[in-house]
Amino acid sequence: MSEELILIGEIVNTQGHRGAVRVLPLTDFPERFRRLKSVYLEQGPVRRLVHIGRVSYHKRFVILEFREIPDMNAAEKLKGAQLKIHRSELVPLPDGHHYVFDIVGSSVFDAEGEYLGVVEDVLRTGANDVYVVKSGEGDSLLVPALKTVVRDIDLARRRITVVLPEGLRE
């Protein structure tokens, strides 16, 4: 069984004439690219390992040169490709923090054990994250990701227990 691959960026364009690509980082840790030696490129069903030669940053983009990509013509064919890494290469998070992709898809229950729905998305509001919980009936419940509300996150069971503030369900 192969280890799960995690999406960290998408190639949006070429950069210059030497085969570099412009990557939109899909991570809170764009500095991670400097530490990586290789990444997996995925385009549809095709996946291949490429080795990182150079890394630089321009505005909100990461500029990468791959050893296997010799020129701009080869780089042009990579537009839209996703960059992925093994889960074991993730930046470790402090205790009590979780990656969004680990939260999405988790079942949410209140403190009494009543099923509320499944986390469909996590909104970044600045002050705190908000879990978008979709019920079986299709209704959405916005649950603030606060310690006073989210009492337990069990990633192994993909289960989150919450204590909803008064009036949040209405």
Curated annotation (Swiss-Prot):
Underlying gene: rimM
SUPFAM superfamilies in UniProt: PRC-barrel domain, Translation proteins
Main location: cytoplasm
Oligomeric form and interacting partners: Binds ribosomal protein uS19.
Function: An accessory protein needed during the final step in the assembly of 30S ribosomal subunit, possibly for assembly of the head region. Essential for efficient processing of 16S rRNA. May be needed both before and after RbfA during the maturation of 16S rRNA. It has affinity for free ribosomal 30S subunits but not for 70S ribosomes.
GO molecular function: ribosome binding
Domain notes: The PRC barrel domain binds ribosomal protein uS19.
InterPro entries: PRC_barrel-like_sf, PRC_RimM, RimM, RimM_N, RimM_N_sf, Transl_B-barrel_sf
Name of this protein: Ribosome maturation factor RimM
GO CC term (a single one): ribosome
Keyword vocabulary terms for this entry: Chaperone, Cytoplasm, Ribosome biogenesis, rRNA processing
Source domain of life: Bacteria
Domain annotation PRC barrel: ranges: 94-168
Protein family: Belongs to the RimM family.
Subcellular location: Cytoplasm
A biological process from GO: rRNA processing
